[in-house]
A protein has these predicted regions:
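N-terminal, active-site-proximal structural segment of metallo-dependent hydrolase catalytic domains
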Residues: 1-78, 85-97
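Soluble or luminal CAZymes and related metallo-dependent hydrolases
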Residues: 41-50, 67, 111, 136-137, ...
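Short, solvent-exposed loop/turn segments at secondary-structure junctions
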Residues: 10-13, 68-70, 89-91, 124-125, ...
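Active-site beta-strand/loop signature of hydrolases that rely on acidic residues for catalysis
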Residues: 5-9, 50-75, 145, 153-156, ...
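Metal-dependent phosphoester-hydrolase catalytic domains
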Residues: 124-133, 174-186, 191-263
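Short glycine-/acidic-enriched loop or helix-start segments at secondary-structure transitions
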Residues: 17, 72-75, 79-81, 165, ...
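Surface-exposed cleft-lining segments at the edges of enzyme active sites
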Residues: 35-39, 129-134, 154-164
Length: 263
């Protein structure tokens, strides 16, 4: 059975135009859209645009990071998916920060609060668990999801810089292996490390049989107990663009990563 997996850091539900000149304080403060000949930067709630892209892509499991907590139900409904949400950092005043973020997402940015959201299509979720990896400098949580099929998913947004990321990844990976026991496992998310910059990925493959990393990316989909059908790859920038007012709006500052595994 093929399992199509996707991981995507949603950048707190914001867009990120390729032209830096469009990322202005004028837009951030006044909510005014900025334009060039091909792209537009908007400062408004984009839940419908993110939901439309996610719903239209082909995947069985989606690992999302920096997901606005207020979006979890809407994204799950749009994708006809079961959901497992764990809150991560800066969620102290959610009713207030959520209201501000809905009005002006670029102004509040990451201070809205965040979550790791795992979405699952075509099967039920049998178990939901989480592990708090650290509280400082930011709260980092790994989300463990066991599906009715037996497949296990661990969704992580690791800390930066490299030393913190390596510790988060190592701790979460050991916990993931223990939690999954002998069942197949997909371990991924925004790991904040490129395989070219750290030996942690070689260690994960050697000691825990978790592989392969995504070339040139900090977002990864590693698997154990599954064959690799299509190796992890970053989607082209244009694949995360939507059209608004005749111009392209590029969602998030991260490209999604997709892979196919065979059980």
């Amino acid at each position: 059975m093929a399992v199509r997996a996707l991981t995507w850091n949603l950048f707190h539900g914001r867009d990120f135009p390729p032209n830096p000149a469009l990322r202005t304080w004028r837009s951030r403060l006044t909510r005014r859209s900025e334009r060039d000949t091909g792209h537009m930067q908007v400062n408004r709630d984009l839940v419908e645009e993110f939901a439309s892209l996610l719903a239209g892509w082909s995947w069985d499991v989606a690992l999302l990071q920096e997901c606005p907590p207020r979006w979890s139900r809407a994204l799950a409904a749009a994708c006809h998916a079961a959901a497992h949400r764990v809150l991560t950092s800066r969620n102290w005043l959610l009713p207030v920060t959520s209201a501000i973020a809905e009005w002006n997402p670029d102004l509040i940015a990451s201070w809205e609060g965040g979550s790791n959201l795992t979405l699952v299509r075509g099967t039920r979720i049998d178990e939901r668990r989480s592990l708090v990896l650290r509280r400082l400098p930011e709260r980092r949580v790994a989300a463990f999801t066991r599906l009715e099929t037996g497949l296990c998913i661990v969704n992580l947004h690791a800390s930066g810089p490299n030393a913190l990321a390596e510790r988060d990844i190592a701790a979460a990976a050991r916990w993931a292996i223990e939690s999954a026991a002998d069942t197949p496992l997909i371990f991924g998310g925004d790991l904040n490390l490129r395989s070219e910059d750290s030996s942690i990925f070689d260690e994960l493959e050697r000691s825990l049989a978790l592989a392969p990393p995504t070339p040139g990316a900090i977002d990864h989909l590693l698997a154990r107990g599954l064959d690799v059908g299509e190796r992890p790859r970053s989607l082209a920038p244009e694949e995360r663009e939507v059209e608004i007012g005749g111009l392209a709006v590029r969602l998030s500052d991260h490209p999604p990563v997709a892979a196919t595994f065979i059980d």
